[in-house]
Design a protein with these regions (language model features):
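Pre-Walker A adenine-sensing motif
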Residues: 1-11
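Hydrophobic anchor at the beta1->P-loop junction of P-loop NTPases
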Residues: 19
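The conserved Walker
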Residues: 23
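A conserved segment at the C-terminal end of the G1
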Residues: 28-41
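Short beta-strand-centered segment that lines the nucleotide-binding/catalytic pocket of NTP-utilizing
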Residues: 39-54
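ATP-dependent small-molecule kinase phosphotransfer cores
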Residues: 54, 59-163
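Conserved phosphate-donor/acceptor-positioning beta-strand/loop module used by diverse small-molecule
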Residues: 152, 170-223
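NTP-dependent small-molecule kinase module
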Residues: 222-285
């Protein structure tokens, strides 16, 4: 572990952390707080995925849709217009839109085969974006003179890490440069996340085997072909299963390489100093 004791953490001029856990429990809230009032460099993995690795795929998807409109198609073919994704730290909708949801095309769904292809692209992009953390730690220091760095991970980081392998490439590399911190929710948090997701379901990234299992079980349970699947119904149906599947693996990552902070404690944090003190209190040694 990068910081072996509260003393190591408190006395270190350079502090680098990696926040992970389910979306909605405070990763980005804390990252923005540290950036805005604590002189921390904020590295958003989702933003990196969408801009560096998936940007061309996203833009091509927009162009494909535009080409179905004769008016826009002519302008595109003559380079009269330019189409690209306007990705922002606080608005990653172009990335989510590209990932899509499988099911009935008339309800906004895409074929499952195409959905799987996009999922694989996202996996590669997320692995590369996570490993880019090392470069950005060095870049933040050499270019902008930041001694403090927060890696704001995607909720799906657990899907690209083998938590049972101490030599996992992503975690073995990153644990040399950052302190991994799992923000752990309660059953009440899980229920709130499910309720929130049900109201506004969004595309998700799944591990391949888990996704195929969920898809086949859904088709069997509903007794329908994939072209009749309501995309939102499937995404909502699988969300709780996804949470339950991820939670023990989040814990294993924290036990192997980092520490655990309770979401209820993180929610009380109002300043960078509050947060660094909370980390210190949860480091052993």
């Amino acid at each position: 572990m990068l910081y072996k004791s509260p003393s190591d953490w408190n006395t270190s001029q350079s502090k680098s952390i990696m926040l992970f856990g389910m979306s909605g429990l405070g990763k980005t809230y804390i990252s923005e707080l540290l950036r805005n009032n604590g002189d921390w460099f904020h590295y958003s993995v989702d933003y990196r995925i969408g801009t560096r690795y998936m940007g061309e795929h996203i833009a091509d998807n927009f162009k494909k849709e535009a080409m179905s409109n004769p008016f826009l198609a002519k302008l595109l073919q003559t380079d009269a217009i330019y189409i690209s994704a306007n990705m922002k730290f606080n608005d990653l909708s172009p990335l989510s839109t590209y990932l899509g949801k499988p099911g009935d095309p008339s309800k906004g769904g895409i074929p499952f085969k195409e959905y799987m292809r996009r999922q694989k692209l996202h996996r590669d992009a997320e692995i590369n974006s996570m490993l880019d953390t090392v470069h950005f730690i060095q870049r933040a220091k050499s270019l902008y003179d930041y001694d403090k760095f927060v890696c704001d991970t995607s909720g799906s980081v657990v899907e690209i890490v083998n938590c049972d392998d101490q030599d996992d490439k992503v975690m073995k590399t990153l644990s040399q440069y950052v302190l991994p911190i799992w923000i752990e929710g309660t059953e009440e948090h899980t229920e709130e996340l499910v309720k929130r997701f049900t109201k506004a379901p969004k595309p998700m990234y799944y591990s391949e085997n888990f996704l195929i299992e969920c898809w086949n079980n859904f088709l069997k349970e509903k007794n329908i072909p994939e072209t009749q699947v309501d995309p939102n119904e499937f995404i909502v149906w699988g969300y709780r299963k996804l949470l339950e599947n991820r939670l023990p693996r989040y814990r294993k990552i924290a036990e192997n390489w980092g520490i655990i902070l309770k979401a209820s404690d993180v929610a009380k944090v109002k300043s960078a100093d509050n947060f660094t003190s909370l980390i210190s209190a949860n480091l052993k040694g």
